[in-house]
Amino acid sequence: MKIYLVGGAVRDALLGLPVKDKDWVVVGATPQEMLDAGYQQVGRDFPVFLHPQTHEEYALARTERKSGSGYTGFTCYAAPDVTLEADLQRRDLTINALARDDDGQIIDPYHGRRDLEARLLRHVSPAFGEDPLRVLRVARFAARYAHLSFRIADETLTLMREMTAAGELEHLTPERVWKETENALTTRNPQVYFQVLRDCGALRVLFPEIDALFGVPAPAKWHPEIDTGVHTLMTLSMAAMLSPQLDVRFATLCHDVGKGLTPKNLWPRHHGHGPVGVKLVEQLCQRLRVPNDLRDLAKLVAAYHDLIHTFPILQPKTIVKLFDAIDAWRKPQRVEQIALTSEADVRGRTGFEASDYPQGRWLREAWQVAQAVPTKEVVEAGFKGIEIREELTKRRIAAVANWKEKRCPNPAS
C-alpha cells in the first residue's frame, strides 16, 4: 500500500498558495484493508475513506470509463492493480494531475509543473470531453487564478467549444451549474468565469439572459465601453473589489439584464429595463435554483439601481418608499448591499473606475436618519393599528427631509 497527496494541495503548494483541503490516493489496497486500518468508508459509487484521526479523504486509485451521457455517466474501476499514473490520467487539468509521495517527491506524468510555470490550464487527455462539468470547472479555475496570469490552452478551449456545440452542457443539472457558478463568484476575478463561458459558447446555453447583453448598445456619453455585456462584466469586476459578499456580486451580475429585451428601435436608450429585468432575474434564478435571498436582492437591484443614481433629486417621500420597497426595516443589510451594487454599476465603466459615488453615502445616511425615528414615541402618542404605520412613515419622511435639506440639497432648488 502506498499513499500519495494529490491534486489541489500539491498544485497550490507549488504555487506558494495556502493549502486548504488535502486529498489522498491509496495505491495497492483493497476496501477491506482500509477498513481494517481504521478508515471509515463514505463513498457509495467508488471507495473513498476518511482517515480515523484527520478525517481527510483517502480514495483508492481508480479509473473511469464513459458509460452514459452527462457528468454522471461513468463506470469506475478501483482495485489494487490501478497505478497512480492511471488514476492521475482521469483528472481534468494537468495542474491537477500532480502527486507527492512521503519523501516529498513530485510525481508528474502529464507535465503539470511545466504548465504551472507557463500559467496554462491544459486538459490531461481527450477524456476531458466526456464530462461537461469540466467546462465550468476550467472557467472557474481561470477566474480563480486570473491574478496569477493563467490562461486556457488553445487546444483546451477548442475542446470546450466542441463540447458545448455537441450539446453536452445540456446534461448538467441546475444544482451543479449553480454550485460551480457560486464558487466562481467568490473568486478574486469572477468576471473571468463568465468571459470564458462566453468564449466557448457556454454562456448562451447556461446564462442566455447575460449572453443576450453582448452587442446591446448603451449611450456612449454614459457608457464609453458602449456594449452592455462588456459593462456587465466590468461591473462584476468592480463589485468583487468592493465586496466579498456573494449576494452583492450576483445582484451586480444581474443588474442590467432587462436591457436585452428593451425595444431595439429605442436603442441605445433602455427605458423601463428595470421591471423587465426583474422578470428575467426571476426566470434565471428559478431555472438554476438560486437561493431565495440572492434572488430577492438581485430583483431589487434590477428594479432600483437607476433610482439610486438619481438620489440628489429624490423627494424624501420617495426615499422612505424605497426603504419600504426593499424591506429595509426588517432586512437593514440590504441598504448597504444596494449601495455597493449601485456604486459598482457607476464605476464599472471605461474611465470611471476611480470615480466617487456620493449617492451611496447619501443612501446610507438617509437610512440611518429614517430608522432612528422611534416607534415607541408614536405608540405612546396614542396612535393605534394602521395609524402607527402611517404616523411613523410621516415622521420618517420629515426626518429625511430635514437631513436632506442640510446634507444633500436638491440641485434644482
From Swiss-Prot:
ATP binds at residues 8, 11, 91, 137, 140. Magnesium is required for nucleotidyltransferase activity. Its EC number is 2.7.7.72, 3.1.3.-, 3.1.4.-. GO terms for biological process: RNA repair; tRNA 3'-terminal CCA addition. It catalyses: a tRNA precursor + 2 CTP + ATP = a tRNA with a 3' CCA end + 3 diphosphate; a tRNA with a 3' CCA end + 2 CTP + ATP = a tRNA with a 3' CCACCA end + 3 diphosphate. CDD domains: HDc, NT_ClassII-CCAase. Mg(2+) binds at residues 21, 23. InterPro entries: CCA_bact, HD/PDEase_dom, HD_domain, NT_sf, PolA_pol_head_dom, PolyA_RNA-bd, tRNA_CCA-adding_enzyme. Keywords: ATP-binding, Hydrolase, Magnesium, Metal-binding, Multifunctional enzyme, Nickel, Nucleotide-binding, Nucleotidyltransferase, RNA repair, RNA-binding, Transferase, tRNA processing. Monomer. Can also form homodimers and oligomers. A single active site specifically recognizes both ATP and CTP and is responsible for their addition. Comprises two domains: an N-terminal domain containing the nucleotidyltransferase activity and a C-terminal HD domain associated with both phosphodiesterase and phosphatase activities. Catalyzes the addition and repair of the essential 3'-terminal CCA sequence in tRNAs without using a nucleic acid template. Adds these three nucleotides in the order of C, C, and A to the tRNA nucleotide-73, using CTP and ATP as substrates and producing inorganic pyrophosphate. tRNA 3'-terminal CCA addition is required both for tRNA processing and repair. Also involved in tRNA surveillance by mediating tandem CCA addition to generate a CCACCA at the 3' terminus of unstable tRNAs. While stable tRNAs receive only 3'-terminal CCA, unstable tRNAs are marked with CCACCA and rapidly degraded. Belongs to the tRNA nucleotidyltransferase/poly(A) polymerase family. Bacterial CCA-adding enzyme type 1 subfamily. PANTHER family: MULTIFUNCTIONAL CCA PROTEIN. This is Multifunctional CCA protein. It comes from Salmonella typhi.
